[in-house]
Amino acid sequence: MNLIEQLEREEIERLGKIIPDFSPGDTLVVNVNVVEGDRKRTQAFEGVVIAKRNRGLNSSFIVRKISSGEAVERTFQTYSPLIASMEVKRRGAVRRAKLYYLRDRTGKAARIREKLPARRIQQRSVAAD
């Protein structure tokens, strides 16, 4: 590990942000701090993660949502001080790392299947009678 990577890792630890484990296809709610004049408030942005870029301190992700029939995409820096919190609403089952093809789709064609948790098969101990 070189010096730059070490400095970035220390900075990430210093920030102490709680970032949930999410991936492309997941529906994410990002609470963003918005400053309007002298007021500061939190605005929720809920949408599907279409891309994630893992670059240490420079990591980012793109969230896409449909608002009043218009598609809105917003790029967030993962460790930005403007992000108050993040929450994963639902897991999506996708087979691609970048979901840019969703830009060309509308309505039902743009839906993503939900990833269901794997069922655990319980081992039954057979008692000898």
Swiss-Prot record:
Record GO terms (molecular function): structural constituent of ribosome
Gene Ontology terms: cellular component:
cytosolic large ribosomal subunit
One Gene Ontology term from the biological process aspect of the record: translation
Entry's Gene3D superfamilies?
Answer: 2.30.30.790
Q: Which InterPro entries match?
A: Ribosomal_bL19, Ribosomal_bL19_CS, Ribosomal_bL19_sf, Translation_prot_SH3-like_sf
**Entry-linked Pfam families:** Ribosomal_L19
UniProt keyword list: Ribonucleoprotein, Ribosomal protein
Q: Which NCBIfam families match?
A: rplS_bact (TIGR01024)
Could you tell me what this protein does?
Answer: This protein is located at the 30S-50S ribosomal subunit interface and may play a role in the structure and function of the aminoacyl-tRNA binding site.
Q: Which family does it belong to?
A: Belongs to the bacterial ribosomal protein bL19 family.
Write down the PANTHER family for this protein, in alphabetical order.
LARGE RIBOSOMAL SUBUNIT PROTEIN BL19M, RIBOSOMAL PROTEIN L19
Name recorded for this polypeptide: Large ribosomal subunit protein bL19
Q: Which gene encodes it?
A: rplS
